[in-house]
Curated annotation (Swiss-Prot):
InterPro entries: PsdUridine_synth_cat_dom_sf, PsdUridine_synth_TruA, PsdUridine_synth_TruA_a/b_dom, PsdUridine_synth_TruA_C, TruA/RsuA/RluB/E/F_N
Enzyme class label: isomerase
Name listed for the protein in its UniProt record: tRNA pseudouridine synthase A
Sorted UniProt keywords: Isomerase, tRNA processing
Annotated residues for binding of substrate: 111
Gene Ontology terms: biological process: tRNA pseudouridine synthesis
Taxonomic placement: Bacteria, Pseudomonadati, Pseudomonadota, Alphaproteobacteria, Rickettsiales
Catalysed transformations (reactions): uridine(38/39/40) in tRNA = pseudouridine(38/39/40) in tRNA
Subunit structure: Homodimer.
Gene giving rise to this polypeptide: truA
Role description: Formation of pseudouridine at positions 38, 39 and 40 in the anticodon stem and loop of transfer RNAs.
Source species of the chain: Ehrlichia ruminantium (strain Gardel)
CDD domains for the chain: PseudoU_synth_EcTruA
EC number(s) recorded for this UniProt protein: 5.4.99.12
Stretches that traverse the bilayer: none
Length: 246
């Protein structure tokens, strides 16, 4: 029986989604151990997105297989019982066909990046948003968005260690909402390059600081060179919001 689960987590104290060794503090391995504790079955949990260390999730999707046909509420409650000491929660469980794959069946992934633009330190949003002290010109950031949306070669916006075969991606939506001092950047695509969202955010922030005009984003894009783009925004401001499968 294949189970599809939706997971929420605070990524602050984890090395990221993907397990790296048998004793790693990864979300994937912690989930696998929790499932084993209630089912006595060794499973592999496949996630829709391999979030980095510090990245949070509101709606990460994953799947795994069990030989036992449990009621979905039992699966949810049992996993959460064994996650009680971790900042991870299973918020939804459903049974699905065996041809469903959390990663490869995904049609669109949605991310949110949170910025707080003020001089005072963060309290409630500490490790949950990027604190930018310099006043940002949000209007210029919004103007820059049009140069990023659409189908492009995103070589300037990928990490050097990115293993994706092609740098060409399609950003379906990129929008910025501003309610001083909070800036939310929402972005969606079928898939992303390694650090693509965080480099886009870092570049938009540099535009907002006045380092370059909005139209300079086009030059950065055409350069196909990581050194032309801005800094990689901190991981703790990034949230994996949800996944579409239709």
């Amino acid at each position: 029986m294949r189970y599809k689960i939706v997971i929420e987590y605070d990524g602050s104290n984890f090395i990221g989604w993907q397990k790296q060794n048998h004793n790693s503090n990864s979300i994937q391995e912690i989930l696998e151990k929790a499932i084993f504790k209630f089912s006595k079955q060794h499973v592999t949990v496949y996630g829709a997105g391999r979030t980095d260390a510090g990245v949070h999730a509101l709606g990460q999707v994953a799947h795994f297989d069990l030989t036992t046909d449990f009621e979905t509420y039992i699966v949810r409650n049992a996993i959460n019982y064994h996650l009680i000491s971790h900042a991870i929660a299973v918020v939804h469980v459903e049974k699905t066909d065996t041809d469903f794959h959390a990663r490869f069946s995904a049609k669109r992934r949605y991310y949110l990046y949170k910025i707080v633009n003020r001089y005072s330190p963060l309290t409630i949003d500490r490790n949950r948003a990027w604190l930018v002290h310099t006043p940002l010109n949000v209007e210029n950031m919004i103007k820059a968005v049009c140069y990023i949306k659409g189908n492009h070669n995103f070589s300037s916006f990928r990490a050097k260690c990115c293993q994706s075969k092609s740098p060409v991606k399609t950003v379906d939506n990129l929008s910025i909402t501003y309610n001083h001092p909070y800036i939310d950047i929402n972005i969606s695509a079928i898939s992303f390059l390694h650090h693509q969202v965080r480099i886009i955010v870092g570049t938009l922030v540099e535009c907002g600081k006045g380092y370059f005009p909005p139209e300079h984003i086009k030059t950065i894009m055409e350069a196909n060179n990581r050194s032309y783009a801005g800094t990689t925004a901190p991981s703790y401001g990034l949230y994996f919001v949800k996944v579409d499968y239709s």
